[in-house]
Structure formats: structure tokens, C-alpha cells
């Protein structure tokens, strides 16, 4: 584009913005003075979870109302989920009454999370009853995912409530109670006022605080104290007592995690903190952050099995960091006044990306990962991004911007479609930032100094302090002057080729490949029942032979294999994990092509892959020509 055209375009945009501003100003000036707002209502909510093993929850609400049309919302845009994921599809049995009379209601035609109720004269409150049906398995995640088994459940309050329109979520108050199955114990950051048998009553709080305070409960609960001031604890519910039967020393790294996080940030922004850790093979597996808790869920044996502990070592640190980065400091576009206003996800490279970097660093500093385990994880992240052809058409910024429209995208074709890459790619980018800060200050400062300024003192109870892109840039410049605006614009709009490896290289290491699988990859393959051949022939395939993904431009894709097909045989022998690994390694000394018999919608084809380089797996190799900065980054402080 020629400069004259650029100047004209900029002028046109500025002038258009001026006209919009002027029009808004004129419109606002004509408005009458707004009368004093009505006092915010208090809603009572009684949840009956005694049928949680059947995966159904019953709720009754009393909502203040006046004659006319009462508009109520089912929460839609959920914090931490970054999209319109409120599971309204699992809302059932909805009924509104007043003084014993059933009231007419209708769902809004333009928004399925909004309901309009006709309230008769002289009515001051409306009773609502509803059921929430928790999915029995499936691939749904977060509060839409499976959350109950025969022995446990995690209650996300947003799934069992409605709230009246006209106020922010911070203004509407809730008095909540919960009835649990007999004998079940519970844990939550929500203050309790009383308990009688299996019924618990909670302190009146804002809707914001209620939704931010899940309840974990079950027949088998183990509580591990991590720190006294402020109180922090690990609350573990599991499907069996055996899943909780680990020596107390296993929890030492979690105590050190709390200690190292305090040193990293220099302050906390919670009154107490609960790691709500669910161990079950029958709930959705994820982590979801809250101000004073995290809802983290993994398989039943993730605590008792050392190999699985390594595989899941990054989850709790990540969700814990979110208390500072995401809950306390939050992008302005995510700091919405209620759960209906659309969120803007453009700064997820900070919200999730920086959290991923800091969570991994804390996993190293706390001892949840050894230095080698940390490096193996970093190598796998880097190699995955280095084999991500979707970067050629879709930049990092769009992986954040597009989150609301990409919810529930399948794993097939993920390497070409791209997914939530602002997690992993920004581990590499924030490592790069950390090394630049160290270089610019001759090793005096690091990302720790940024965290102190941006998310640190003073201590406070839960609150939200929004930020913008400009504040990120300005705070980085406060720590270490540099062209941070240019750096981040380049990182967010870059298309490669290849992953951003400069942070690894600046820290004294190099990404290399050899035929040896790291324990991390071995554990990943065992847990997922998959073979990770992405770095050799560009194939991710289940032990059953089902092709999960292929990487464009690599041998499997070039030969014609695609996701959804099924490998039946390898070099004429039935497909198994051992057959596949052995045949792939044998290509290094064989002149013959690797032959895969593949089923595709009832048809069989033998694909011949012209590949002769054996198995390839990523590692980090020490670069002795540079200081070992990476080891210093993950060293306990």
C-alpha cells in the first residue's frame, strides 16, 4: 500500500471515530436524568444434590418480582471458559409459580439463555424450580461436562440458577443452601453459616462470588493443609479411598508451590484458597480457575501413580496462577458486568499464555517436576508448535479472537485448523520475554519483577483489576525498557515458518530430535492409548489404529492418509503399538517404503510412505556456548 493511501485511510478512520463519538455525545445529552436504581434483589437458592449419583440436580429459587414481565437469565458467558458455554441444553423441568399459581413463561427468540415470565398483579416474588442434568460421559468440558459419579460430584452454581435482569452480577445477592447425599463430605471457598446433617447453608454473597465458588463433595474426601496464613488447602475427592492413599510426603511439592507462588507475586488476593482436586475416570478432565479455588479434575489414579503424577504435574500450578493472572488481573474485555454480555478474548495470550508459562515455571521451582521433566515438557511444546502447519494461515492472535466460535471443535485436523494455541505458543513467547528482560538488565531482573509490579502487592481480598494491551506494554517497559509493543505485535501476527524458539535458544538450550522417547511421551502414549509419530511421519494414531490427526506436508499426509481413517496393518502385520513403533524405527535401515493398510469408509488402501529416518522425539540439548539461563529460571527461590 502506498503512503498517500495509508495517510488517507488513517484520516478517514479517525474522522469516522470522531463522528461516532459526536453522535453518541449528542444522544446522551438528550437523555433525561436516570431515576435512582431499585435496590438489588436477594435471591434464595436451595439445591438438592441427593440424586447426584443419578446425575440430576434439583433447584428451587425465590426471585423478587413486580407485576409485568420478569426477565431472568441462565448464565451464558462463563468466566474461565471464554465463550457462551453455559449449559442451558441441560436445563430441564423449568417452572415458575407465585402463590400456588403457575406462571406463563417463554424463552427469548434471539437468546436461548433468556426467559420472560408474566407476573400477575400484587405479586412480590416468583418461585422457580428447575433440574440440571449432568452429562453422563461425553467430550463436553468445564461446567458443561460430566461432573457426577456414584461417589462424588462437583457443583458449579451457574448450572442450577437463574438471575433477574437489570443488575450486575456483583449487585444481585444470593442466599444459597445445598443438600448432599447422606455421609458425603464437602469443600468450598464459600463461607458456611450453618450445617444440619446433610444440609449446608451458606453466607449471603453476590452472584459473582457464588458462581466463583464451586462445591466439591463426595463420600471420600482428604484435606491436606498447605499453608496457615492465609489458609490454603488441598481438598481431594475421589471415587475410591485407595485413590487417596498416598504418603504425606507426596504433598510436599504442593506446599512448596504455595511458597514459591508467594515469592513470585509477593502478595495474594484471596482470603483463603482451596485446591478442589477431583480424581475420577468418569468426570470431564480439565482445570477451571476461581479467585479462591480451582476446580481441577484428572483420572482416579493420578495421585497414587508416580508416572501419572508427572503427566498431570502442570495442572494445579496453572490453575493456581490464575488467581493472580486471570481472576485478579483480568483483560478488560473479559471483565464483564454479568454473564450475558459477550466476552472479548483478544488478550488470552496473557490470561492463558502467561499463566501457562508461570505455571510450568512453578512446577519446576516447587519440585512437582524435576529439571529434566520440565525440559521434556518444554521440548514437547516447542516441537508441537514447530509441526503446526496451521500457523501458516492462522496467526496466534486469531486463535484467541476465535475462541467463542471454536468451542467444541474436534481433535481431527487440529494441526491444520489450530486450536487453543495461545496456551502453548505463549509458553515459548513468555520464555522469550523472560530472557529479554534478563538480557536488558544484565541479569538483575526477570519475569518475577514483572509479576511483582503487575499482579503483586498489596494483599487484598478477591477483586478484579482490568488491564489492556497498553498496560502490558507499559509495565514491561517499567521493568526493562525495550520495544515491547513491536515485539508483541510481531509475535501475535507472525506466521512462522516454525515455532518461536528464540527463548529456548536465549536460555542456553536447543531443540533436537532423536529416536528415544522421553518418559513424558511414554506416559502420554500410555494414558491416551495413542502413538505420537508427529515428528517423524506426521501422524497421531490411536493404538486401535484410528488416525487422530495428520500433519500437512509430512509423509503420512503426502501419501494420502487423513484423520478418521483407520490403520489396519503395518508392513503386512496387524496394527498394534509395538508393531507400529518397531516398523517406524526399522525405516532407518530399510530401503523399502513403510506400508500402512488403511480402512476408509469401508474401503481398504495400502499407502506407501517414502520415509527412512526412524522414530523422532523432541529433547532439549544444552548449548555450551551460552549460559544456562533456563536452569536458573526454574530454580527454587
Task: Label every model-predicted segment.
Residues 61, 222-348, 354, 358:
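Juxtacatalytic substrate-recognition/specificity segment
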Residues 10-22:
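Bacterial N-terminal signal peptides
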Residues 30-77, 158-159:
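Early extracytoplasmic/domain-onset interaction patches
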Residues 1-7:
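N-terminal secretory signal peptides that target proteins for export/translocation
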Residues 42-44, 56-60, 69-71, 112-114, ...:
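Intrinsic-disorder/low-complexity, polar/charged segments enriched in Ser/Thr/Lys/Arg/Asp/Glu/Gln
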Residues 25-38, 301, 632-637:
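Compositionally biased, proline/threonine/alanine/serine-rich low-complexity intrinsically disordered stretches
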Residues 50, 62-64, 79, 84-93, ...:
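Non-catalytic architectural context of zinc metalloproteases
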Residues 359, 369-637:
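C-terminal recognition in membrane/secretory proteostasis and scaffolding
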